Amino acid sequence: MIIKPRVRGFICVTTHPAGCEANVKQQIDYVEAKGPVVNGPKKVLVIGSSTGYGLAARITAAFGSGADTLGVFFERPGSESKPGTAGWYNSAAFEKFAHEKGLYARSINGDAFSDEVKRLTIETIKRDLGKVDLVVYSLAAPRRTHPKSGEVFSSTLKPIGKSVSFRGLDTDKEVIKDVVLEAASDQEVADTVAVMGGEDWQMWIDALLEADVLADGAKTTAFTYLGEKITHDIYWNGSIGAAKKDLDQKVLGIRDKLAPLGGDARVSVLKAVVTQASSAIPMMPLYLSLLFKVMKEQGTHEGCIEQVDGLYRESLYGAEPRLDEEGRLRADYKELQPEVQSRVEELWDKVTNENLYELTDFAGYKSEFLNLFGFEVAGVDYEQDVNPDVQIANLIQA
């Protein structure tokens, strides 16, 4: 079939398998051009490995370090009549290229919050890898069924303590609008922490330790975003921020548990990028469109693969990691440069419907958004028939 993009709100309901494959190949090419990651990981588990930063972490491990990788994700395959999710096609492409290189690459499709997926993962590590030396935690999910109580928690994106009004960008209508977000209730904050906080990361590491599948010197990292004051009211100081602060608490206990192995646990702070998760945050499309404009002008623009590749080389496996006073690894420093943030702030209130394309890089934002789903990727012929029914060999289905 011939597949065209169909966008509804902050999601594209169609995906293009050939475009997703080309997108993965571009990321692989970027990492390989940088050369090997010195002293990089050899056997890697990526929890949330199919899109965005998690996919970039899997690509960097495999093609920067020659690592065997096991990926965990929750994606939907395509059929002859309907495309699957982008994460499915990304993972199929990743495995194809990894196998061509002679690397081990297997994936588990299921709910990473569940005990069953943790059990399947441990079984697979024992059978195929023995032990892993890096665990990347990169889950973005709207809800979580607690594996012990069965309770279902949903995350919300709201400020804490007071309602907040701010400028936003309606990406469908391409108009600037004022948005008001009501304050989260205590229950909503607690539920968001239950979904997006550090408890599940801790459960994963506890399960892996108990099963004795973490190698000596094993590292683990979970990804976070801090941002600057423009986004603080709805992000860092909001319900999502409460979950991210929980990561900062939980990492301390995880680090202590890995100490006997000579291991380490760190939260890694990455820059704002276009992902399916970030496009759902009301102010992010406008912020990102301005950020892209400013950072491209300054020659410092980066996407997921540039960020994660740099994180591995500089901090996770670098001689002098970039640490902040909280002990987090920082890869977001270019975004937070005062000259970047002050310019974004200066332009923030000047953007109108008329000058949207002139003052911001909304065109670049839209293009990167479509790239997520396999569209507008260079070198892909979108008039060609493609088969949406793509298999992932040796997939372990939970």
From Swiss-Prot:
It catalyses: a 2,3-saturated acyl-[ACP] + NAD(+) = a (2E)-enoyl-[ACP] + NADH + H(+); a 2,3-saturated acyl-CoA + NAD(+) = a (2E)-enoyl-CoA + NADH + H(+). Belongs to the TER reductase family. The gene is fabV. Pathway: Lipid metabolism; fatty acid biosynthesis. GO terms for biological process: fatty acid biosynthetic process. One of its GO terms (molecular function) is trans-2-enoyl-CoA reductase (NADH) activity. Gene3D superfamilies: NAD(P)-binding Rossmann-like Domain. Involved in the final reduction of the elongation cycle of fatty acid synthesis (FAS II). Catalyzes the reduction of a carbon-carbon double bond in an enoyl moiety that is covalently linked to an acyl carrier protein (ACP). It can use both crotonyl-CoA and trans-2-decenoyl-ACP. It is able to convert trans-2-enoyl-ACP of different length (C2 to C16) to the corresponding acyl-ACP. Monomer. HAMAP family: FabV_reductase. This is Enoyl-[acyl-carrier-protein] reductase [NADH]. NAD(+) binds at residues 48-53, 74-75, 111-112, 139-140, 244, 273-275. Pfam families: Eno-Rase_FAD_bd, Eno-Rase_NADH_b, Enoyl_reductase. Disruption phenotype: Cells lacking this gene produce significantly more unsaturated fatty acids than wild-type. The ratio of unsaturated fatty acids to saturated fatty acids in wild-type is 0.76, whereas in the fabV mutant this ratio is increased to 1.12. The major unsaturated fatty acid is the C16:1. When triclosan is added to the reaction mixture, the reductase activity decreases to 15% of the untreated wild-type. The keyword Oxidoreductase applies.
